[in-house]
Design a protein with these regions (language model features):
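Acidic, glycine/proline-rich low-complexity segments that act as flexible tails and inter-domain linkers
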Residues: 1-30, 56, 82-99
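Residues at alpha-helix boundaries and short interhelical turns
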Residues: 2, 23, 40-44, 58, ...
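Short alpha-helical scaffolding segments that buttress acidic/His motifs in well-ordered protein cores
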Residues: 12, 16, 32-39, 67-74
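Aromatic- and histidine-enriched alpha-helix N-cap/loop-to-helix transition segments
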Residues: 27-28, 62, 75
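Mid-chain, well-packed structural core segment of small domains
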Residues: 40-69
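C-terminal structural segments of small proteins and small subunits
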Residues: 65-90
Length: 99
């Protein structure tokens, strides 16, 4: 997509930047919120991505897991557990990458 439609992709990227800076949330809060949004949409790749971004922004593993736990009453237990497993995969990989 990026190679075929570079102008459209650039506009999309700019929209994301503008949305991120339009209010008072910091990078960690944004990443945790986006993790929850990705969980609600059941987008596994996005959960992994926003989990990594949350770590990079200074979120602890406990904070990221808590963000997923909050989805239980909205998504239901099975969906929350699936999202939590995606988070745990990402956290495990991040921990292995440290060594």
């Amino acid at each position: 997509f990026q190679g075929t439609y570079p102008e459209l992709f650039a506009a999309y990227e700019e929209l994301g930047k503008q949305a991120s800076t339009a209010g008072p949330l910091d990078k960690k809060q944004i990443a945790l919120i986006k993790s929850g949004i990705a969980a609600g949409a059941k987008m596994e790749g996005a959960v992994h991505s926003h989990c990594r971004r949350a770590l990079e922004a200074g979120a602890s593993p406990a904070e990221i897991r808590h963000a997923m736990l909050l989805s239980v009453t909205t998504l239901g237990f099975p969906s929350m557990m699936a999202c939590l497993s995606w988070v745990d995969e990402t956290l495990d990989t991040a921990e292995k990458d440290k060594t």
